[in-house]
Regions:
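Expand to "…catalyze enediolate/carbanion chemistry for C-C bond making/breaking, isomerization
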Residues: 1-265
Length: 265
């Protein structure tokens, strides 16, 4: 009898093996707390050191330099820390890359690109990261995560998923719902609406399909019920089992273990 692994068609490419959870931290204090949590729970989640929502206006340089310092420090126990830069329309996104890539490009787990409005936006930022890495003498491919949270990004998601160095497609719910200008009630940013509203469910399915068909990881948005780990668990479970997401964001410490538990194979 033929074994299923011999009979079933295989694409030849495997999905990246990365943690099923990433925890966002926007200040040095919270990043260091995240590292302490990694030491306690083990290497089961990444930490995203956030420039976009973390840097104070006028202090973008200092914030990026802080991220370089902590990522390279002994406080980073497993080398499982990435960063989110400013979006394409922000004047400092190139500056973020100019600081982060030469300073921590050998150690950053990934770079997340937010709020792209088209394939061309994402392509421009990916190419700038590649050029900056080459100029800095970094030979590794720095994994890139692209946040799909606008109409334009969703429209181009299949093409964006083919960009080099892209490892993850993140679905961003809040900006996506906001972009519908009231057509999707705000209550659908939470469960059960975030899984049941047809426009949101269709968008999530489209992101997952684009990611998996291009051998990259689809990542689910946060749970806004911050202090309810059971709700986080149920959201992660539904995202994994009913939509095919293989990773999920955390923005509150108690969400991490809930996501990891729900997304275990």
């Amino acid at each position: 009898m033929t074994h299923p692994k011999e009979a079933l068609f295989g694409s030849g490419d495997n999905l990246p093996i990365i943690p099923s959870c990433e925890h966002f931290a926007g200040s040095e204090k919270l990043i260091l707390k995240g590292f302490e949590m990694q030491k306690k729970l083990g290497p089961v989640f990444d930490i995203t050191c956030d420039c976009e929502d973390g840097a104070e206006t006028g202090k973008e340089v200092a914030h990026a330099e802080m991220i370089v310092r902590v990522v390279n420090s002994d406080a980073n126990p497993y080398g499982m820390a990435g960063t989110r830069i400013h979006d394409f329309d922000h004047p400092d996104w190139r500056q973020d890359i100019d600081i982060l890539v030469p300073g921590a490009g050998e150690k950053l787990a990934y770079i997340t690109i937010p709020k792209s409005t088209s394939y061309e936006d994402a392509k421009t930022q990916v190419e700038y990261i590649q050029a900056t890495a080459k100029k800095a003498g970094i030979t590794r491919e720095i994994p890139i995560h692209v946040l799909i949270e606008t109409h334009g990004a969703l429209r181009d998601v299949e093409k964006t998923a083919t960009l080099p160095w892209v490892q993850v497609l993140d679905f961003g719910l809040m900006d996506f719902v906001s972009g519908y200008q009231g057509a999707i009630p705000a209550s659908n940013m939470r469960s059960p609406g975030q899984f049941e509203h047809r426009l949101i469910a269709a968008a999530k399915a489209k992101v997952v399909q684009a990611a998996l068909s291009n051998h990259i990881i689809p990542c689910h948005n946060v749970t806004l019920d911050l202090k309810n780990p059971y709700q986080t668990y149920k959201d992660a479970e539904k995202a994994r089992n009913e939509f095919g997401f293989m990773r999920m964001w955390s923005i509150y410490p108690t969400q991490v273990q809930a996501i990891v538990d729900a997304m275990k194979p």
